[in-house]
Regions:
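Helix-loop-helix module between adjacent transmembrane segments
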Residues: 22-119, 188-193, 205, 276-283
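Helix-boundary and loop/linker segments of multi-pass membrane transporters
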Residues: 59-64, 174-180, 259-265
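Membrane-helix interface residues
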Residues: 18, 62, 121-122, 131
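Small-residue-rich segments of transmembrane alpha-helices in multi-pass membrane proteins
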Residues: 59-64, 134-148, 223-227
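Hydrophobic alpha-helical segments and their helix-loop junctions in multi-pass secondary transporters
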Residues: 40, 79-87, 91-106, 110, ...
């Protein structure tokens, strides 16, 4: 969930596709459910046999070294576009938010360098803790920006959706004539994304380092994190009718556009005050 897609692709889908973007909430809430059954078994076998990769697990299960090699190659090829997408997204964010003071390429290299350093020095557990801090930070940023842009551009959620319905009623529907997505495609997007969710090689690697109990707890709690994506989608909806289509090269640029054109000093102060602990406010 917590990736550059959340801040670029998520708002972009809401801005350009409307209600079709809600499939993201569905697959994030349901994607890990199969791991409730699979995960604990993977964890136990991984600790017992000292597995490191997904290929180790499958190769041992089917007694095939050839399968280990194939899984390794497929995993590597699958990670290349995934990692490239993340690094490109960070490079773009650095470039836009620094008003070209950091170039696209330098921003991507900076993001890659930070990741390489903390993974190389801290290992798997260090990467896991970085995920925790990243999630907390992104939750805060997402809710602050989501609430701010809705209130500053429309006054309230009700006003925002009323304006969208008034200008384009089918934009908030699924499967109707004129809507951005058919019911079949919407459903298939959810199913395919759910299946893909539990096929990532790093899901196996992380399961080897934890316990069956923690895996089950994580699976049960994980749907709550879909709440994080609500304000992300609100950002995209808030931009409808505000950001001209020809102002963007592609829909994924909508959040950087809003930040650079509609985030004022008062908006930054609003974000800070929103998250000051209440005891300090009381004093």
């Amino acid at each position: 969930i917590f990736s550059t897609f959340a801040f670029l692709g998520g708002p972009g889908w809401a801005y350009s596709k409307g209600a079709a973007s809600l499939y993201i909430l569905a697959y994030c809430a349901l994607g890990l459910m199969p791991w409730y059954i699979i995960g604990p078994k993977v964890a136990r076998l991984g600790k017992k046999s000292n597995y490191i990769t997904m290929g180790d697990f499958l190769g041992d299960r089917y007694n095939s070294k050839f399968l280990v090699i194939i899984i390794g190659i497929v995993s590597l090829l699958a990670f290349i576009p995934y990692l490239t997408l993340q690094i490109k997204g960070m490079g773009y964010i650095f470039n836009v938010l620094t008003f070209d003071n950091i170039s696209y390429n330098n921003g991507a290299l900076l993001a890659l360098g930070v990741v390489v350093i903390y993974v190389a020095t801290s290992g798997v557990r260090g990467a896991a803790w970085s995920d925790v801090f990243q999630a907390i930070l992104m939750l805060i940023v997402a809710w602050v920006l989501g609430i701010y842009f809705v209130e500053s551009l429309h006054g309230s959620l009700g006003n925002m959706f009323s304006k969208i319905i008034e200008d384009n009623p089918d934009f908030l529907t699924i499967g109707n004539e004129g809507s951005k997505i058919s019911s079949a495609r919407y459903s298939s997007n959810i199913v395919v994304s759910m299946l893909g969710f539990v096929m990532w090689p790093h899901l196996f690697t992380k399961s080897y380092t934890t316990t069956a109990r923690r895996i089950k707890l994580t699976v049960l709690v994980y749907p709550i994190f879909a709440i994080f994506l609500l304000p992300v989608l609100f950002i995209g909806f808030a931009a409808i009718g505000v950001v001209p289509n020809d102002a963007l090269g592609r829909p994924g640029e909508v959040l950087p556009y809003l930040i650079t054109h509609h985030l004022t000093e008062s908006g930054i102060l609003y974000g800070i005050v929103t998250f000051i602990p209440s005891p300090f406010l009381g004093n």
